[in-house]
């Protein structure tokens, strides 16, 4: 006969209830309190009691992992890929471990952007005081001075930060598929300036200050007997609450509060801020955007807010499985027409790369990214995106519009 851990923990409470139910009014009051306690105990939370400490390394070496020459994350000793279920039946602990590794990956990618891609980290807001919350973007040295071409990269929503397309790909597959580094390196090699946005860095977290409740003053007008009775009830309530908390969350994490970054409190705000303070000031005659997933929505919002400026400065936009919606975002007719001529959305599809895919919305053309995995669409469409930008630039130079509505591998350049 097997007895669950939760049953063993609750057994003393049940026995206690059985014993005190035979007593008088005071004992019945205790029974009521214990019943209330049992009704509020979350058995899933209760199981946290047996979790190992949520104390994880802060370096890749501490996790005993490293990226090999192919950019794959491998265990230093065994050479095996990352294992999520490090401890069986401890999903929450495994998830926290994964998140801790993810934070290290984010810092590692930041280092690669600076050291491997030679980008500089630029703090925003540009006029921030020393004490206020700040974010940052990455730029090539010639981002604002390159007279010809500028490429702007925007990732999707979630835990990803500047330089990443998908954390899952970085951890489980490789750096090439999961980061923006191949785009950055090729862009620099082909003479583009580069700006890497950081649209999910919207706030900083600080520990919530503890609120100290002052006890009632002895000089209160309340009768001493009534005050003593209230204090007794308060102490008993606190005791019951502490008893419950001990089981509910033995590894209670700190309560945090969010301090939002001025003018960068959302991906949409961030895109507009970077446009106003950097992209709009850039010397480049041709600006190109690559925007993945929610990044596409942020670009459409930017266009709604800065339509004339975007039309004047942006030559072409490559979207990858964008989640924008021209109806919900209330994009006007002139914006939809511009997008049809100057944008292309590489969507998740089992069709071959660049095959036309039907669209229900009257916005930009949709073609297959050559994969049905959402997070892989940027990487799989990588060569097609650069070809699209080259064609758009040449078409602009010769005063022609690129025929993006008919893009596929079967269409030759002469037909444009």
From Swiss-Prot:
Pfam families per the UniProt record, alphabetical: Arb2
Active site location: 293 (nucleophile)
- Per the record, the coiled-coil ranges are none
Where does the record place it?
Nucleus; Cytoplasm; Endoplasmic reticulum
GO biological process annotations for this chain's record? mRNA processing; neural crest cell development; regulation of alternative mRNA splicing, via spliceosome; regulatory ncRNA-mediated heterochromatin formation; RNA splicing
List the GO terms this entry assigns under cellular component, sorted alphabetically. endoplasmic reticulum; nucleus
User: Membrane-spanning regions, if any?
Assistant: none
**Chain intervals with Basic and acidic residues compositional bias:** 223-236
- Signal peptide (UniProt feature, chain positions): 1-18
Annotated region (Disordered), positions in chain: 208-247
- For the motif Prevents secretion from ER, give the residue ranges: 413-416
Q: Which SUPFAM superfamilies match?
A: alpha/beta-Hydrolases
Q: Report the main location listed first in the record.
A: nucleus
Q: Which InterPro entries does the UniProt record give? A: AB_hydrolase_fold, Arb2, Arb2_dom
| Keywords tagged on the record | Cytoplasm, Endoplasmic reticulum, mRNA processing, mRNA splicing, Nucleus, Signal
Biological role: Plays a role in the regulation of alternative splicing, by interacting with AGO2 and CHD7. Seems to be required for stabilizing protein-protein interactions at the chromatin-spliceosome interface. May have hydrolase activity.
Q: How does it assemble?
A: Interacts with AGO2. Found in a complex, composed of AGO2, CHD7 and ARB2A.
Q: What's this protein's family per the entry?
A: Belongs to the ARB2A family.
Q: What is this protein called?
A: Cotranscriptional regulator ARB2A
The protein's organism comes out as Homo sapiens (Human)
């Amino acid at each position: 006969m097997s007895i669950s851990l939760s049953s063993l923990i609750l057994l003393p409470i049940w026995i206690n209830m059985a014993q005190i139910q035979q007593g008088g009014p005071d004992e019945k009051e205790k029974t009521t309190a214990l019943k209330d306690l049992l009704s509020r105990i979350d058995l899933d939370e209760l199981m946290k009691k047996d979790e190992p400490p949520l104390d994880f390394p802060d370096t890749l070496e501490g996790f005993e992992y490293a990226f090999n020459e192919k950019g794959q994350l491998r265990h230093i000793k065994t050479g095996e890929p990352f294992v999520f279920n490090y401890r069986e039946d401890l999903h929450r602990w495994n998830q926290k471990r994964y998140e801790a590794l993810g934070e290290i990956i984010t810092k590692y990618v930041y280092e690669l952007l600076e050291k491997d891609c030679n980008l500089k980290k630029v703090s925003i807001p540009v006029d921030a005081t020393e004490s206020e919350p700040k974010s940052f973007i990455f730029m090539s040295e010639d981002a604002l001075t390159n007279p010809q071409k500028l490429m702007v990269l925007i990732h999707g929503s979630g835990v990803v930060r500047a330089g990443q397309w998908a954390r899952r790909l970085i951890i489980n597959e490789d750096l090439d598929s999961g980061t923006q580094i191949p785009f950055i390196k090729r862009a620099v090699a082909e003479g583009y300036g580069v700006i890497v946005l950081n649209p999910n860095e919207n706030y900083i977290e600080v520990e919530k200050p503890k609120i100290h409740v002052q006890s009632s003053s002895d000089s209160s007008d309340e009768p001493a007997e009534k005050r003593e009775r209230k204090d007794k009830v308060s102490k008993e309530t606190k005791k019951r609450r502490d008893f419950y908390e001990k089981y509910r969350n033995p590894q209670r994490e700190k309560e945090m509060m969010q301090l939002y970054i001025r003018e960068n409190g959302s991906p949409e705000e961030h895109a507009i801020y970077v446009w106003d303070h950097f992209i709009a000031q850039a010397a480049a005659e041709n600006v190109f955007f690559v925007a993945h997933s929610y990044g596409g929505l942020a670009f459409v919002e930017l266009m709604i807010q800065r339509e004339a400026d975007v039309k004047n400065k942006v030559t072409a936009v490559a979207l990858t499985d964008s989640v924008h919606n021209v109806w919900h975002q209330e994009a006007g007719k002139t914006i939809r027409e511009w997008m049809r001529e100057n944008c292309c959305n590489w969507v998740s599809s089992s069709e071959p790369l660049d095959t036309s895919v039907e669209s229900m919305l009257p916005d930009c053309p949709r073609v297959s990214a050559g994969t049905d995995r959402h997070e892989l669409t940027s990487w799989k469409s990588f060569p097609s995106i650069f070809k699209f930008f080259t064609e758009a630039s040449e078409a602009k130079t010769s005063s022609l519009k690129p025929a993006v509505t008919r893009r596929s591998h079967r269409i030759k350049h002469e037909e444009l």
